[in-house]
Amino acid sequence: MEINNEKKKLSRQSSSFRLRSPSLNALRLHRVFDLFDKNNDGFITVEELSQALSRLGLDADFSDLKSTVDSFIKPDKTGLRFDDFAALHKTLDESFFGGEGSCCDGSPESDLEEAFNVFDEDGDGFISAVELQKVLKKLGLPEAGEIEQVEKMIVSVDSNHDGRVDFFEFKNMMQTVVVPS
């Protein structure tokens, strides 16, 4: 992949979607790996990665993607194992964003703001049910199927009952999420 052209493409896209180490810890990276590994065989093939990126609106030239990914696949393997995927992520982070903390200060607050902005697609400061549904669909999650289900998700977080989630409601929700150890 030609890095300069890819940097230009990424800089034109929303700054809310980044492959940054501070906001994507090992647990989150495992979740991404599992989402991309469509057949659950423990490997991400170039085809699976290409499809996942396309669902996220990040279309990449297949031959460039294959060339890059192939350099991380171990001999006699059909795709990226998690460790290979993590190494690819780290290399892309360093190449495109200058490594850890280059874009934001890496504080929990800025990480939450960045995560919020992924869902707030129109930038109005609120997450609507339609915006949440779009992101869930891009991620291939079944919860995106019915707008009524997505609206229930919004209502469960919407403490001021205005039908949408603002940053403070999002932050409160994220701070109450328990991550299994």
Curated annotation (Swiss-Prot):
GO molecular function, one term: calcium ion binding
Organism: Arabidopsis thaliana
Pfam families per the UniProt record, alphabetical: EF-hand_7 (PF13499)
Alphabetic keyword roster: Calcium, Metal-binding, Repeat
Name the record gives this protein: Probable calcium-binding protein CML43
Binding-site residues for Ca(2+) 3, renumbered to this chain: D158, N160, D162, R164, E169
GO cellular component terms attached to this protein's record: cytosol; nucleus
Entry binding sites for Ca(2+) 1: D37, N39, D41, E48
Organs and tissues of expression: Expressed specifically in roots.
A GO BP entry: response to calcium ion
Protein residues bound to Ca(2+) 2: D120, D122, D124, E131
Gene that specifies this protein: CML43
PANTHER family associated with the record: CALCIUM BINDING PROTEIN
Tree of life domain: Eukaryota
